[in-house]
């Protein structure tokens, strides 16, 4: 599916506070944005509390600059009995143009919890 046909879970602009000591956007900030997007997706999909239990295969294939707009797209990789494995793709668009590039990607696993904080089954959709 093309990026144009997908809807981002999160869209945000990188600000000066989001930079590393070298002036580029901090990879930890990018990973955090992917985690937030996946958390939102997981809570909606499980209809309740879902917590992050693993972050795997994190890659930073590109760099982004302050002022660039970041869109995070989330896809379901696998739904288990109590967990979801999600793939996040973070794409940056130049502030004053239309050029886009993948700047981060990774897989995030969430577990659905009940009111007592115990894993609970999630419905199949």
Predicted regions and their residues:
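Hot-dog-fold acyl-thioester-processing enzymes
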Residues: 1-54, 111-125
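HotDog/MaoC-like acyl-thioester-processing domains
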Residues: 2-10, 64-66, 77-125
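Short, well-ordered turn and helix-capping elements at secondary-structure junctions
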Residues: 16-18, 55-62, 92-94
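Hydrophobic beta-strand-centered segment that forms part of the acyl-chain substrate-binding groove
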Residues: 38-73, 77-79, 83-85, 101-106
